[in-house]
């Protein structure tokens, strides 16, 4: 439970830090960079699962932080572009899109675990981490396109 508590607290801090980073550096830019960092850390994590446990856990801890860095920034971005009377509806749609991503991600990870021979095999978990990284790559691409569309200024 101590490890899970540390992951949760680090994720909460990362979410706040990510939102703060976006204030002065551009939301799309930061989320795009964080998404690509998540892809890289997911790939590295998939390669070190067979390493000593402290190395694998360290990489997975960093991956957790990378994943959480953009959550506050995405929510703050939704609130900042919503009109006064539309915030509730826009946040509801934002939440639904997030849950839809989660509902697609879990079966994709499960499928990779099955294809890899089951949850007790490291190579199956490596594939699962790569699938999670693919989700981060998709978010990074969407944000990068938005950043380019806004002239690299947002």
At which residue positions do the language-model features occur?
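Multi-pass alpha-helical transporter architecture, strongest
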Residues: 47, 129-154
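A membrane-interface helix-boundary motif in multi-pass transporters
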Residues: 111-134
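A late C-terminal transmembrane helix in Major Facilitator Superfamily
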Residues: 81-117
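C-terminal transmembrane helical hairpin of 12-TM major facilitator-type secondary transporters
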Residues: 26-74
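Residue-level signature of mid-helix packing/kink "hotspots" within the transmembrane helices
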Residues: 8-16, 103
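Intracellular helix-loop hinge segments at the cytoplasmic ends of transmembrane helices
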Residues: 73-81
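Loop-to-transmembrane helix entry
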Residues: 1-9
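Helix-to-loop junctions at the C-terminal end of transmembrane segments
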Residues: 14-27, 113-114
């Amino acid at each position: 439970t101590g490890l899970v508590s540390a992951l949760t607290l680090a994720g909460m801090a990362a979410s706040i830090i990510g939102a703060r980073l976006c204030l002065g550096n551009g939301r799309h830019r930061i989320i795009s960079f964080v998404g690509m960092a998540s892809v890289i850390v997911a790939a590295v994590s998939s390669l070190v699962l067979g390493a000593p446990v402290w190395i694998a856990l360290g990489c997975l801890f960093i991956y957790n932080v990378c994943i959480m860095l953009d959550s506050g920034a995405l929510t703050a971005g939704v609130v900042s572009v919503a009109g006064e009377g539309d915030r509730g509806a826009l946040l509801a749609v934002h939440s639904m899109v997030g849950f839809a991503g989660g509902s697609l991600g879990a079966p994709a990870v499960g499928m990779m675990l099955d294809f890899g021979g089951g949850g007790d095999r490291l190579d199956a978990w490596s594939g699962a981490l790569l699938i999670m990284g693919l989700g981060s790559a998709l978010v990074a691409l969407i944000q990068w396109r938005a950043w380019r569309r806004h002239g690299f200024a947002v």
